[in-house]
A protein has these predicted regions:
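Polyanion-binding surfaces on beta-sheet-dominated domains and ring/shell assemblies
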Residues: 1-378
C-alpha cells in the first residue's frame, strides 16, 4: 500500500511505450530548439483564464483554468485568534514577549489541498501544500521604508499580527476541480497567488493593546497584500509592493530548460525542480526563496531493448547498427533511438541555467508576476 501511494505521487506517469519516450526525449533535447508536443516555446506557459472574488463568504478567492481543461479554485478565510506564548517566551520578560508577538508565526497560515483521486493524507497533496505554505511564511521583508511595505514588515507572518495578544489566522483551501493531466503545482501556485492578492481584512478601529474592534464597512477593508493604483501597475511601479511568492515547475531535458511542462514532457525529464520566487522590494528584482527537487517519473519507466540484444532480431540487423554514444547531458552511454530511464543526477550548469532563466531581468519569473498583477481583483 505504501509503495502504491508513493508511486501515485510521482506526477502521474503516462502509459507511453519506450519508442514514444525515446521520440519525446530526442525532440525535447534538440540543442537550443526543442520541439514540444503542443508547439510551445521552452518558456511559454499554457493559455489560461483567471478571475477573482468568485466565492461568497470568503476574504479572498480566485479561479484559474488552463486551456487543457484543468481548473483550480482557492478560497482564503481569516479569523481572529488569541496569541498563545510559550513558557520560555513569558519567562524571558516583556522584551521577549514583544519580539515573539510582533514577528508572527508560521503556524498561523494553514493550507489544505484537495485533488480528485487522492486522499487528504496522500503524499502528493501533503507535499504540495507544505511546499507552498513554506514559501508563503518564509518570504520575509527586510525593513519597511517605502510604498506599501510598511504594513508588510516581517512578511506575511508580520502582517497577521494585530497586537501582542491577538493575531489573524489564515485558512487557504485549494481545490483542483478535475483530474490532474500533469503535475498540478503551477496551476495551484498561480491560483493561490491570485487569491491572496484579492484577500481583504476588515479595517482595525481599536488601538494599541485593546481587544480588536473592526469597521463593519467592507468598502474600507484593507488588502492583505497592499496594492497600488492602476497607473502604478501599468507603469511598472508595482514592484515596490510585496507580493505572494509563486512556485514554478521547471524541467531539464538534455541541455534545454522547459517551463510549465506537460504530462508527457515530465515523463522524460532529466530533472524536475520547483522554484519559489518573490519580488525583492529593495533591489527591484526577483528573490529566490527555495528550490525543491521532485523525483523524475522517468526513473519508473521501462527501458527499451536494442536490436543487438533482442533475441527476436538476431541476424536481422548489422552488428554495427547499435553503437552506444555518450550523452553530454547525463554522461551516460546510450544507443540512439533506444530509451533508457534516467539515472544519476544532473549537471550543475543545467541547474544554474534553470535558476538564471527564472530570476534574470525580464525573465520568466517577472513575466508571470506581471501577468498576475494585471488581473482585476476589485
Amino acid at each position: 500500500m505504501s509503495n502504491q501511494r508513493q508511486a501515485s505521487s510521482a506526477s502521474q506517469t503516462p502509459h507511453l511505450s519506450p519508442a514514444e519516450l525515446s521520440y519525446l526525449y530526442t525532440s525535447l533535447s534538440l540543442p537550443k530548439s526543442p520541439i514540444r508536443p503542443d508547439g510551445r516555446s521552452p518558456t511559454q506557459f499554457r493559455p489560461l483564464t483567471a478571475e477573482s472574488n468568485i466565492l461568497p463568504g470568503t476574504n479572498g478567492s480566485a479561479r484559474i483554468g488552463f486551456a487543457d481543461g484543468t481548473q483550480a479554485i482557492v478560497g482564503v478565510k481569516a479569523e481572529v485568534e488569541k496569541t498563545v506564548l510559550s513558557t520560555d517566551t513569558l519567562a524571558s520578560g516583556e522584551g521577549g514577549e514583544s519580539t515573539a508577538a510582533t514577528s508572527g508565526h508560521g503556524s498561523w497560515v494553514q493550507m489544505s489541498i484537495e485533488i480528485p483521486g487522492f486522499r487528504d493524507d496522500d503524499a502528493l497533496p501533503v507535499f504540495l501544500s507544505e511546499m507552498m505554505r513554506e514559501s508563503l511564511v518564509g518570504a520575509v521583508v527586510e525593513g519597511g521604508d517605502g510604498g506599501g511595505d510598511v504594513m508588510m514588515a516581517g512578511g506575511l507572518k508580520g502582517r497577521l499580527v494585530i497586537n501582542k495578544r491577538w493575531h489573524w489566522r489564515l485558512y487557504i483551501d485549494v481545490l483542483l476541480l478535475s483530474q490532474p493531466l500533469s503535475y498540478p503545482l503551477p496551476l495551484l501556485s498561480l491560483t493561490t497567488h491570485l487569491a491572496l492578492l484579492s484577500t481583504k481584512l476588515p479595517k482595525l478601529k481599536s488601538q494599541g493593546e485593546e481587544d480588536p474592534f473592526f469597521d463593519d464597512d467592507w468598502e474600507v477593508a484593507e488588502y492583505l497584500y497592499p496594492r497600488g493604483s492602476k497607473l502604478k501597475a501599468t507603469s511598472g511601479l508595482a514592484s515596490q509592493y510585496v507580493r505572494p511568492p509563486v512556485t514554478l515547475l521547471v524541467v531539464s531535458v538534455g541541455e534545454n530548460v522547459i517551463f510549465d511542462p506537460s504530462r508527457e514532457e515530465i515523463a522524460v525529464a532529466d530533472a524536475v525542480l520547483a522554484i519559489s520566487v518573490t519580488r525583492d522590494t529593495e533591489a527591484g528584482n526577483l528573490k529566490l526563496l527555495s528550490i525543491r527537487t521532485i523525483d523524475p517519473p522517468s526513473r519508473l519507466t521501462q527501458p527499451a531493448v536494442p536490436n543487438s540484444e533482442n533475441v527476436n532480431m538476431l541476424g536481422a540487423t548489422a552488428p554495427t547498427e547499435d553503437i552506444a554514444v555518450l550523452n553530454p547531458a547525463t554522461g551516460e552511454e546510450e544507443v540512439p533511438g533506444v530509451w533508457r530511464p534516467r539515472r544519476g543526477g544532473v549537471k550543475r550548469s543545467v541547474i544554474a541555467n534553470m535558476i538564471k532563466t527564472v530570476l534574470k531581468k525580464g525573465g520568466v519569473g517577472e513575466e508571470v508576476l506581471e501577468g498576475l498583477e494585471g488581473v482585476e481583483v476589485e
